[in-house]
Protein backbone atom coordinates (compact mmCIF):
# COMPACT_ATOMS: atom_id res chain seq x y z
CA UNK A 1 0.00 0.00 0.00
CA UNK A 2 1.53 3.35 -1.09
CA UNK A 3 2.37 6.05 1.45
CA UNK A 4 -0.30 8.44 0.14
CA UNK A 5 -3.02 5.87 0.83
CA UNK A 6 -1.58 5.10 4.26
CA UNK A 7 -1.69 8.78 5.25
CA UNK A 8 -5.23 9.17 3.92
CA UNK A 9 -6.37 6.10 5.86
CA UNK A 10 -4.85 7.53 9.05
CA UNK A 11 -7.35 10.40 8.83
CA UNK A 12 -10.42 8.95 7.12
CA UNK A 13 -10.65 5.76 9.16
CA UNK A 14 -10.59 7.42 12.62
CA UNK A 15 -13.03 10.16 11.54
CA UNK A 16 -15.64 7.53 10.79
CA UNK A 17 -16.04 6.46 14.40
CA UNK A 18 -16.72 9.86 16.00
CA UNK A 19 -20.49 9.58 15.58
CA UNK A 20 -20.50 5.86 16.30
CA UNK A 21 -19.04 6.46 19.72
CA UNK A 22 -21.52 9.23 20.45
CA UNK A 23 -24.25 6.73 19.59
CA UNK A 24 -22.61 4.04 21.73
CA UNK A 25 -22.32 6.35 24.74
CA UNK A 26 -25.94 7.47 24.44
CA UNK A 27 -27.28 3.93 24.37
CA UNK A 28 -24.81 2.27 26.73
CA UNK A 29 -24.26 4.92 29.41
CA UNK A 30 -27.50 6.92 29.32
CA UNK A 31 -30.29 4.54 28.34
CA UNK A 32 -30.52 3.31 31.93
CA UNK A 33 -30.59 6.89 33.24
CA UNK A 34 -33.27 7.72 30.66
CA UNK A 35 -35.36 4.81 31.94
CA UNK A 36 -34.94 5.77 35.60
CA UNK A 37 -35.57 9.49 35.11
CA UNK A 38 -38.53 9.26 32.72
CA UNK A 39 -40.35 6.04 33.64
CA UNK A 40 -42.25 4.83 36.70
CA UNK A 41 -40.95 1.31 37.37
CA UNK A 42 -41.39 -1.05 40.27
CA UNK A 43 -38.60 -3.39 41.35
CA UNK A 44 -39.94 -6.30 39.26
CA UNK A 45 -39.97 -4.17 36.11
CA UNK A 46 -36.48 -2.84 36.79
CA UNK A 47 -35.17 -6.37 37.36
CA UNK A 48 -36.83 -7.48 34.11
CA UNK A 49 -35.12 -4.68 32.20
CA UNK A 50 -31.76 -5.77 33.64
CA UNK A 51 -32.53 -9.38 32.64
CA UNK A 52 -33.35 -8.24 29.10
CA UNK A 53 -29.97 -6.54 28.84
CA UNK A 54 -28.16 -9.65 30.00
CA UNK A 55 -30.20 -11.90 27.68
CA UNK A 56 -29.40 -9.62 24.75
CA UNK A 57 -25.69 -9.94 25.50
CA UNK A 58 -25.95 -13.73 25.67
CA UNK A 59 -27.60 -13.52 22.27
CA UNK A 60 -24.58 -11.51 21.14
CA UNK A 61 -22.39 -14.43 22.15
CA UNK A 62 -23.74 -16.12 19.04
CA UNK A 63 -24.45 -13.04 16.96
CA UNK A 64 -21.04 -11.33 17.12
CA UNK A 65 -18.77 -14.19 15.97
CA UNK A 66 -21.42 -15.24 13.44
CA UNK A 67 -21.50 -11.71 12.06
CA UNK A 68 -17.72 -11.78 11.88
CA UNK A 69 -17.88 -14.97 9.85
CA UNK A 70 -20.55 -13.50 7.56
CA UNK A 71 -18.29 -10.51 6.93
CA UNK A 72 -15.36 -12.83 6.18
CA UNK A 73 -17.54 -14.57 3.60
CA UNK A 74 -18.83 -11.38 1.97
CA UNK A 75 -17.53 -10.68 -1.55
CA UNK A 76 -18.67 -7.48 -3.29
CA UNK A 77 -17.09 -4.84 -5.51
CA UNK A 78 -17.04 -2.59 -2.41
CA UNK A 79 -15.12 -5.19 -0.38
CA UNK A 80 -16.36 -7.25 2.55
CA UNK A 81 -16.49 -4.52 5.21
CA UNK A 82 -18.18 -1.45 3.71
CA UNK A 83 -21.57 -2.97 2.78
CA UNK A 84 -22.10 -3.94 6.41
CA UNK A 85 -21.00 -0.50 7.57
CA UNK A 86 -23.80 1.05 5.51
CA UNK A 87 -26.52 -1.44 6.44
CA UNK A 88 -25.57 -1.45 10.10
CA UNK A 89 -25.32 2.29 10.67
CA UNK A 90 -28.61 3.16 8.95
CA UNK A 91 -30.62 0.55 10.85
CA UNK A 92 -28.96 1.43 14.17
CA UNK A 93 -29.89 5.08 13.66
CA UNK A 94 -33.56 4.11 13.33
CA UNK A 95 -33.38 1.96 16.47
CA UNK A 96 -31.68 4.73 18.48
CA UNK A 97 -34.35 7.24 17.54
CA UNK A 98 -37.18 4.85 18.46
CA UNK A 99 -35.59 3.92 21.81
CA UNK A 100 -35.66 7.49 23.16
CA UNK A 101 -38.92 8.65 21.61
CA UNK A 102 -41.62 6.50 23.18
CA UNK A 103 -44.33 7.48 25.65
CA UNK A 104 -44.98 3.95 26.92
CA UNK A 105 -44.94 3.26 30.67
CA UNK A 106 -44.96 0.18 32.91
CA UNK A 107 -44.99 -3.30 31.40
CA UNK A 108 -45.76 -2.12 27.83
CA UNK A 109 -42.56 -0.09 28.03
CA UNK A 110 -40.63 -3.10 29.35
CA UNK A 111 -41.79 -5.17 26.36
CA UNK A 112 -40.90 -2.36 23.95
CA UNK A 113 -37.51 -2.04 25.66
CA UNK A 114 -36.84 -5.74 25.09
CA UNK A 115 -37.57 -5.51 21.37
CA UNK A 116 -35.47 -2.37 20.95
CA UNK A 117 -32.54 -3.74 22.92
CA UNK A 118 -32.31 -6.90 20.83
CA UNK A 119 -32.62 -4.90 17.61
CA UNK A 120 -29.79 -2.65 18.77
CA UNK A 121 -27.62 -5.69 19.50
CA UNK A 122 -28.11 -6.93 15.94
CA UNK A 123 -27.75 -3.66 14.05
CA UNK A 124 -24.85 -2.17 16.03
CA UNK A 125 -22.92 -5.43 15.65
CA UNK A 126 -23.11 -5.13 11.86
CA UNK A 127 -21.14 -1.90 11.64
CA UNK A 128 -19.02 -2.32 14.78
CA UNK A 129 -17.43 -5.60 13.74
CA UNK A 130 -16.97 -4.51 10.14
CA UNK A 131 -15.39 -1.24 11.31
CA UNK A 132 -12.83 -2.69 13.72
CA UNK A 133 -12.32 -5.71 11.46
CA UNK A 134 -10.83 -3.39 8.83
CA UNK A 135 -7.74 -2.54 10.88
CA UNK A 136 -5.74 -5.72 10.11
CA UNK A 137 -6.46 -5.15 6.39
CA UNK A 138 -5.10 -1.60 6.59
CA UNK A 139 -1.67 -2.55 7.93
CA UNK A 140 0.35 -5.50 9.23
CA UNK A 141 3.21 -3.29 10.40
CA UNK A 142 3.24 -3.20 14.22
CA UNK A 143 4.19 0.50 14.48
CA UNK A 144 1.61 1.57 11.90
CA UNK A 145 -1.08 -0.53 13.55
CA UNK A 146 -0.25 0.99 16.95
CA UNK A 147 -0.50 4.46 15.41
CA UNK A 148 -3.77 3.73 13.61
CA UNK A 149 -5.32 2.05 16.66
CA UNK A 150 -4.36 4.84 19.05
CA UNK A 151 -5.49 7.53 16.61
CA UNK A 152 -8.80 5.75 16.06
CA UNK A 153 -9.28 5.53 19.81
CA UNK A 154 -8.42 9.24 20.05
CA UNK A 155 -11.23 10.13 17.64
CA UNK A 156 -13.53 7.63 19.32
CA UNK A 157 -12.63 9.21 22.64
CA UNK A 158 -13.45 12.64 21.25
CA UNK A 159 -16.89 11.47 20.14
CA UNK A 160 -17.47 9.73 23.45
CA UNK A 161 -16.24 12.72 25.46
CA UNK A 162 -18.46 15.09 23.50
CA UNK A 163 -21.46 12.88 24.18
CA UNK A 164 -20.55 12.45 27.84
CA UNK A 165 -20.20 16.22 28.25
CA UNK A 166 -23.35 17.31 26.44
CA UNK A 167 -25.88 14.57 27.23
CA UNK A 168 -26.01 14.96 31.05
CA UNK A 169 -25.88 18.75 30.85
CA UNK A 170 -28.74 18.93 28.31
CA UNK A 171 -30.98 16.28 29.91
CA UNK A 172 -30.79 17.03 33.66
CA UNK A 173 -31.10 20.31 35.54
CA UNK A 174 -31.46 23.93 34.49
CA UNK A 175 -30.04 23.55 30.95
CA UNK A 176 -32.33 20.69 29.92
CA UNK A 177 -33.54 20.88 26.31
CA UNK A 178 -37.23 21.74 26.26
CA UNK A 179 -37.17 22.02 30.07
CA UNK A 180 -37.89 18.27 30.20
CA UNK A 181 -35.67 15.17 30.37
CA UNK A 182 -38.25 13.31 28.28
CA UNK A 183 -38.04 15.87 25.47
CA UNK A 184 -34.27 16.31 25.78
CA UNK A 185 -33.40 12.64 25.33
CA UNK A 186 -35.66 12.43 22.27
CA UNK A 187 -34.03 15.44 20.61
CA UNK A 188 -30.49 14.23 21.33
CA UNK A 189 -31.31 10.77 19.95
CA UNK A 190 -32.56 12.37 16.73
CA UNK A 191 -29.42 14.49 16.33
CA UNK A 192 -27.07 11.55 16.91
CA UNK A 193 -29.12 9.31 14.60
CA UNK A 194 -28.56 11.85 11.81
CA UNK A 195 -24.89 12.80 12.28
CA UNK A 196 -23.51 9.29 12.91
CA UNK A 197 -24.01 8.04 9.33
CA UNK A 198 -22.51 11.31 8.07
CA UNK A 199 -19.29 10.73 10.04
CA UNK A 200 -19.07 7.13 8.86
CA UNK A 201 -19.10 8.38 5.26
CA UNK A 202 -15.44 9.39 5.79
CA UNK A 203 -14.56 5.71 6.25
CA UNK A 204 -16.95 4.37 3.61
CA UNK A 205 -15.78 6.73 0.85
CA UNK A 206 -12.29 7.68 2.01
CA UNK A 207 -10.59 4.47 3.22
CA UNK A 208 -8.88 1.94 0.99
CA UNK A 209 -8.05 -1.45 2.46
CA UNK A 210 -5.80 -4.27 1.27
CA UNK A 211 -8.12 -6.73 -0.49
CA UNK A 212 -5.74 -9.66 -0.68
CA UNK A 213 -8.53 -11.75 0.85
CA UNK A 214 -10.47 -11.50 -2.43
CA UNK A 215 -8.00 -13.90 -4.03
CA UNK A 216 -8.99 -16.59 -1.55
CA UNK A 217 -12.27 -18.53 -1.65
CA UNK A 218 -14.92 -17.26 0.74
CA UNK A 219 -14.91 -19.38 3.92
CA UNK A 220 -18.09 -21.23 4.80
CA UNK A 221 -20.18 -19.99 7.69
CA UNK A 222 -20.32 -22.44 10.55
CA UNK A 223 -20.47 -22.30 14.32
CA UNK A 224 -17.85 -25.01 14.29
CA UNK A 225 -15.39 -22.66 12.57
CA UNK A 226 -16.16 -19.86 15.00
CA UNK A 227 -15.67 -22.11 18.00
CA UNK A 228 -12.56 -23.67 16.49
CA UNK A 229 -11.02 -20.24 15.90
CA UNK A 230 -11.62 -19.16 19.50
CA UNK A 231 -10.81 -22.45 21.21
CA UNK A 232 -7.84 -23.21 18.96
CA UNK A 233 -6.09 -19.93 19.72
CA UNK A 234 -4.74 -20.15 23.26
CA UNK A 235 -3.83 -16.45 23.36
CA UNK A 236 -7.33 -15.47 22.24
CA UNK A 237 -8.81 -17.77 24.89
CA UNK A 238 -6.93 -15.90 27.60
CA UNK A 239 -7.37 -12.37 26.26
CA UNK A 240 -11.18 -12.76 26.19
CA UNK A 241 -11.66 -13.12 29.99
CA UNK A 242 -8.84 -10.62 30.63
CA UNK A 243 -10.49 -8.00 28.42
CA UNK A 244 -13.89 -8.77 29.99
CA UNK A 245 -12.54 -8.05 33.48
CA UNK A 246 -11.02 -4.79 32.25
CA UNK A 247 -14.25 -3.69 30.59
CA UNK A 248 -16.24 -4.30 33.76
CA UNK A 249 -13.74 -2.45 35.94
CA UNK A 250 -13.51 0.41 33.48
CA UNK A 251 -17.28 0.78 33.11
CA UNK A 252 -18.57 0.52 36.67
CA UNK A 253 -18.28 4.25 37.39
CA UNK A 254 -19.73 5.50 34.10
CA UNK A 255 -22.30 2.72 33.86
CA UNK A 256 -24.70 4.58 36.14
CA UNK A 257 -23.30 4.46 39.67
CA UNK A 258 -21.13 7.54 39.17
CA UNK A 259 -23.98 9.54 37.70
CA UNK A 260 -26.41 8.96 40.54
CA UNK A 261 -23.66 9.30 43.15
CA UNK A 262 -22.99 12.81 41.83
CA UNK A 263 -26.71 13.67 41.80
CA UNK A 264 -27.30 12.30 45.30
CA UNK A 265 -24.21 13.88 46.83
CA UNK A 266 -23.90 17.20 44.99
CA UNK A 267 -27.34 17.93 43.49
CA UNK A 268 -29.55 17.42 40.44
CA UNK A 269 -27.32 19.22 37.96
CA UNK A 270 -26.36 17.48 34.75
CA UNK A 271 -23.58 20.00 34.29
CA UNK A 272 -21.78 18.60 37.33
CA UNK A 273 -21.82 15.09 35.93
CA UNK A 274 -20.68 16.49 32.57
CA UNK A 275 -17.67 18.02 34.32
CA UNK A 276 -16.99 14.82 36.26
CA UNK A 277 -17.13 12.85 33.03
CA UNK A 278 -15.18 15.23 30.83
CA UNK A 279 -12.41 16.14 33.28
CA UNK A 280 -12.25 12.55 34.43
CA UNK A 281 -11.64 11.43 30.86
CA UNK A 282 -9.27 14.30 29.98
CA UNK A 283 -6.14 12.35 30.80
CA UNK A 284 -7.19 9.57 28.43
CA UNK A 285 -7.05 12.00 25.50
CA UNK A 286 -3.45 12.84 26.38
CA UNK A 287 -2.65 9.15 26.71
CA UNK A 288 -4.18 8.37 23.31
CA UNK A 289 -1.99 11.02 21.68
CA UNK A 290 1.18 9.93 23.45
CA UNK A 291 0.65 6.16 23.30
CA UNK A 292 2.50 5.56 20.00
CA UNK A 293 5.58 7.33 21.41
CA UNK A 294 5.29 5.58 24.77
CA UNK A 295 4.82 2.14 23.21
CA UNK A 296 7.93 2.68 21.08
CA UNK A 297 10.02 3.06 24.25
CA UNK A 298 8.21 1.00 26.90
CA UNK A 299 6.97 -2.53 26.39
CA UNK A 300 3.34 -3.27 27.23
CA UNK A 301 3.84 -5.34 30.38
CA UNK A 302 6.24 -2.81 31.90
CA UNK A 303 3.80 -0.02 31.07
CA UNK A 304 0.94 -1.86 32.76
CA UNK A 305 2.76 -1.77 36.11
CA UNK A 306 2.97 2.02 35.96
CA UNK A 307 -0.66 2.32 34.84
CA UNK A 308 -1.85 0.16 37.73
CA UNK A 309 -0.02 2.39 40.22
CA UNK A 310 -1.66 5.49 38.73
CA UNK A 311 -5.12 3.97 39.14
CA UNK A 312 -4.44 2.96 42.75
CA UNK A 313 -3.54 6.58 43.55
CA UNK A 314 -6.67 7.84 41.79
CA UNK A 315 -9.03 5.48 43.60
CA UNK A 316 -7.51 6.30 46.99
CA UNK A 317 -8.08 10.01 46.30
CA UNK A 318 -11.72 9.34 45.33
CA UNK A 319 -12.38 7.34 48.49
CA UNK A 320 -10.67 9.83 50.78
CA UNK A 321 -12.61 12.80 49.38
CA UNK A 322 -15.90 10.92 49.35
CA UNK A 323 -15.64 9.49 52.85
CA UNK A 324 -13.94 12.34 54.70
CA UNK A 325 -14.69 15.42 52.61
CA UNK A 326 -18.32 16.10 53.55
CA UNK A 327 -17.34 19.40 55.19
CA UNK A 328 -15.54 20.55 52.04
CA UNK A 329 -18.69 21.02 49.97
CA UNK A 330 -17.96 21.41 46.26
CA UNK A 331 -14.22 21.14 46.89
CA UNK A 332 -14.86 17.45 47.55
CA UNK A 333 -16.46 17.20 44.09
CA UNK A 334 -13.34 18.58 42.42
CA UNK A 335 -11.06 16.26 44.40
CA UNK A 336 -13.18 13.23 43.48
CA UNK A 337 -13.13 14.32 39.83
CA UNK A 338 -9.33 14.69 39.95
CA UNK A 339 -9.04 11.21 41.45
CA UNK A 340 -11.26 9.80 38.72
CA UNK A 341 -9.06 11.42 36.07
CA UNK A 342 -5.91 9.86 37.56
CA UNK A 343 -7.59 6.45 37.82
CA UNK A 344 -8.65 6.70 34.18
CA UNK A 345 -5.05 7.09 33.05
CA UNK A 346 -4.48 3.52 34.19
CA UNK A 347 -7.82 2.15 33.05
CA UNK A 348 -7.59 3.57 29.55
CA UNK A 349 -3.98 2.56 29.20
CA UNK A 350 -5.06 -1.00 29.98
CA UNK A 351 -7.79 -0.70 27.35
CA UNK A 352 -5.35 0.40 24.62
CA UNK A 353 -2.94 -2.39 25.47
CA UNK A 354 -5.67 -5.03 25.42
CA UNK A 355 -7.11 -3.69 22.14
CA UNK A 356 -3.73 -4.18 20.46
CA UNK A 357 -3.29 -7.54 22.19
CA UNK A 358 -6.54 -8.81 20.67
CA UNK A 359 -5.59 -7.61 17.17
CA UNK A 360 -2.17 -9.23 17.46
CA UNK A 361 -3.80 -12.64 17.87
CA UNK A 362 -4.74 -12.41 14.16
CA UNK A 363 -1.12 -13.00 13.11
CA UNK A 364 -0.73 -15.57 15.89
CA UNK A 365 -3.77 -17.39 14.50
CA UNK A 366 -2.25 -17.34 11.02
CA UNK A 367 1.07 -18.52 12.45
CA UNK A 368 -0.44 -21.50 14.28
CA UNK A 369 -3.31 -22.49 11.96
CA UNK A 370 -2.55 -20.93 8.57
CA UNK A 371 -5.76 -18.87 8.66
CA UNK A 372 -6.07 -15.24 9.78
CA UNK A 373 -9.82 -15.23 10.56
CA UNK A 374 -9.46 -11.50 11.21
CA UNK A 375 -13.18 -10.67 11.14
CA UNK A 376 -14.01 -13.42 13.64
CA UNK A 377 -11.21 -12.29 15.95
CA UNK A 378 -12.20 -8.64 15.52
CA UNK A 379 -15.73 -9.60 16.59
CA UNK A 380 -14.37 -10.62 19.98
CA UNK A 381 -13.75 -7.01 21.05
CA UNK A 382 -17.33 -5.75 20.57
CA UNK A 383 -18.75 -8.98 21.96
CA UNK A 384 -16.69 -8.73 25.15
CA UNK A 385 -17.47 -5.02 25.42
CA UNK A 386 -21.20 -5.75 25.19
CA UNK A 387 -20.98 -8.65 27.62
CA UNK A 388 -19.06 -6.43 30.02
CA UNK A 389 -21.75 -3.80 29.62
CA UNK A 390 -24.42 -6.35 30.49
CA UNK A 391 -22.58 -7.42 33.63
CA UNK A 392 -22.18 -3.76 34.58
CA UNK A 393 -25.96 -3.46 34.28
CA UNK A 394 -26.33 -6.40 36.67
CA UNK A 395 -23.91 -4.81 39.15
CA UNK A 396 -25.63 -1.43 38.79
CA UNK A 397 -29.14 -2.86 39.17
CA UNK A 398 -28.24 -4.91 42.23
CA UNK A 399 -26.61 -1.82 43.75
CA UNK A 400 -29.67 0.33 42.99
CA UNK A 401 -31.99 -2.22 44.59
CA UNK A 402 -29.67 -2.77 47.55
CA UNK A 403 -29.48 0.94 48.38
CA UNK A 404 -33.10 1.75 47.38
CA UNK A 405 -32.02 4.12 44.62
CA UNK A 406 -35.22 3.46 42.66
CA UNK A 407 -37.34 4.89 45.48
CA UNK A 408 -35.67 8.23 44.80
CA UNK A 409 -35.56 7.99 41.00
CA UNK A 410 -39.27 7.14 40.81
CA UNK A 411 -40.04 10.38 42.65
CA UNK A 412 -37.75 12.28 40.28
CA UNK A 413 -39.34 10.73 37.18
CA UNK A 414 -42.79 11.59 38.54
CA UNK A 415 -41.82 15.26 38.79
CA UNK A 416 -40.16 15.16 35.34
CA UNK A 417 -43.24 13.70 33.65
CA UNK A 418 -45.76 15.89 35.46
CA UNK A 419 -43.76 19.04 34.79
CA UNK A 420 -43.71 18.17 31.10
CA UNK A 421 -47.47 17.60 31.25
CA UNK A 422 -48.00 20.96 32.98
CA UNK A 423 -46.04 22.72 30.24
CA UNK A 424 -48.02 20.82 27.62
CA UNK A 425 -51.36 21.84 29.20
CA UNK A 426 -50.37 25.51 29.10
CA UNK A 427 -49.10 25.41 25.50
CA UNK A 428 -52.09 23.45 24.23
CA UNK A 429 -54.39 25.84 26.10
CA UNK A 430 -53.25 28.62 23.78
CA UNK A 431 -54.65 26.73 20.77
CA UNK A 432 -58.07 25.90 22.24
CA UNK A 433 -61.03 27.00 20.09
CA UNK A 434 -62.86 28.64 22.98
CA UNK A 435 -63.48 32.11 24.36
CA UNK A 436 -60.84 33.66 26.60
CA UNK A 437 -62.46 32.82 29.93
CA UNK A 438 -63.38 29.32 28.74
CA UNK A 439 -59.77 28.64 27.67
CA UNK A 440 -58.46 29.72 31.06
CA UNK A 441 -61.09 27.64 32.86
CA UNK A 442 -60.19 24.56 30.78
CA UNK A 443 -56.49 24.95 31.56
CA UNK A 444 -57.12 25.38 35.29
CA UNK A 445 -59.40 22.33 35.25
CA UNK A 446 -56.72 20.22 33.52
CA UNK A 447 -54.12 21.33 36.06
CA UNK A 448 -56.38 20.37 38.95
CA UNK A 449 -57.56 17.01 37.53
CA UNK A 450 -54.01 15.88 36.68
CA UNK A 451 -52.64 17.05 40.03
CA UNK A 452 -50.23 19.55 38.51
CA UNK A 453 -50.86 22.36 40.99
CA UNK A 454 -47.42 22.06 42.58
CA UNK A 455 -45.88 23.43 39.36
CA UNK A 456 -48.04 26.56 39.11
CA UNK A 457 -48.03 27.82 42.71
CA UNK A 458 -45.74 30.73 41.74
CA UNK A 459 -47.76 31.58 38.62
CA UNK A 460 -50.52 34.16 39.02
CA UNK A 461 -53.85 33.74 37.29
CA UNK A 462 -53.17 36.97 35.41
CA UNK A 463 -49.93 35.56 33.99
CA UNK A 464 -51.69 32.36 32.99
CA UNK A 465 -54.45 34.39 31.37
CA UNK A 466 -51.91 36.44 29.43
CA UNK A 467 -50.53 33.21 27.99
CA UNK A 468 -53.65 31.20 27.11
CA UNK A 469 -55.96 34.12 26.27
CA UNK A 470 -53.63 36.76 24.80
CA UNK A 471 -51.00 34.32 23.42
CA UNK A 472 -48.21 36.39 24.97
CA UNK A 473 -44.99 34.57 23.87
CA UNK A 474 -42.76 36.41 26.33
CA UNK A 475 -45.08 35.57 29.18
CA UNK A 476 -45.24 31.96 27.95
CA UNK A 477 -41.48 31.54 28.38
CA UNK A 478 -41.72 33.11 31.83
CA UNK A 479 -44.50 30.69 32.84
CA UNK A 480 -42.63 27.65 31.46
CA UNK A 481 -39.48 28.73 33.31
CA UNK A 482 -41.47 28.89 36.56
CA UNK A 483 -42.84 25.38 35.94
CA UNK A 484 -39.28 24.15 35.39
CA UNK A 485 -38.05 25.95 38.52
CA UNK A 486 -40.82 24.35 40.59
CA UNK A 487 -39.83 20.94 39.23
CA UNK A 488 -36.17 21.40 40.14
CA UNK A 489 -37.06 22.72 43.61
CA UNK A 490 -39.16 19.64 44.34
CA UNK A 491 -36.46 17.31 43.00
CA UNK A 492 -33.87 19.02 45.21
CA UNK A 493 -36.19 18.40 48.15
CA UNK A 494 -36.35 14.70 47.24
CA UNK A 495 -32.54 14.49 47.04
CA UNK A 496 -32.14 16.24 50.39
CA UNK A 497 -33.84 13.24 51.99
CA UNK A 498 -31.39 10.69 50.55
CA UNK A 499 -29.54 9.02 53.44
CA UNK A 500 -25.76 9.20 53.69
CA UNK A 501 -25.58 5.40 53.70
CA UNK A 502 -26.97 5.38 50.17
CA UNK A 503 -24.38 7.77 48.76
CA UNK A 504 -21.51 6.08 50.61
CA UNK A 505 -22.74 2.71 49.31
CA UNK A 506 -22.63 3.96 45.73
CA UNK A 507 -19.13 5.39 46.25
CA UNK A 508 -17.68 2.25 47.82
CA UNK A 509 -19.24 -0.04 45.23
CA UNK A 510 -17.97 1.85 42.19
CA UNK A 511 -14.45 2.49 43.51
CA UNK A 512 -13.68 -0.88 45.11
CA UNK A 513 -15.11 -2.93 42.24
CA UNK A 514 -13.23 -0.84 39.66
CA UNK A 515 -9.95 -1.53 41.44
CA UNK A 516 -10.58 -5.24 42.05
CA UNK A 517 -11.41 -5.93 38.40
CA UNK A 518 -8.39 -3.94 37.25
CA UNK A 519 -6.08 -5.87 39.57
CA UNK A 520 -7.41 -9.20 38.27
CA UNK A 521 -6.84 -7.97 34.71
CA UNK A 522 -3.23 -7.15 35.49
CA UNK A 523 -2.47 -10.46 37.21
CA UNK A 524 -3.96 -12.62 34.45
CA UNK A 525 -2.34 -10.64 31.62
CA UNK A 526 1.09 -10.85 33.19
CA UNK A 527 0.77 -14.57 33.73
CA UNK A 528 -0.90 -15.82 30.55
CA UNK A 529 -0.41 -13.43 27.61
CA UNK A 530 2.82 -14.23 25.80
CA UNK A 531 2.58 -12.14 22.59
CA UNK A 532 4.85 -9.36 23.81
CA UNK A 533 6.66 -7.12 21.33
CA UNK A 534 9.65 -9.40 20.58
CA UNK A 535 7.45 -12.49 20.15
CA UNK A 536 4.97 -10.67 17.90
CA UNK A 537 7.79 -9.31 15.70
CA UNK A 538 9.27 -12.81 15.43
CA UNK A 539 5.92 -14.25 14.33
CA UNK A 540 5.38 -11.53 11.70
CA UNK A 541 8.88 -12.06 10.33
CA UNK A 542 8.35 -15.81 10.04
CA UNK A 543 5.00 -15.29 8.29
CA UNK A 544 6.71 -13.06 5.72
CA UNK A 545 9.35 -15.73 5.15
CA UNK A 546 6.66 -18.36 4.63
CA UNK A 547 4.90 -16.20 2.03
CA UNK A 548 8.18 -15.51 0.25
CA UNK A 549 8.88 -19.25 0.03
CA UNK A 550 5.34 -20.15 -1.11
Where are these regions (language model features)?
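Membrane-embedded alpha-helical bundles of multi-pass transporters/translocases
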Residues: 1-550
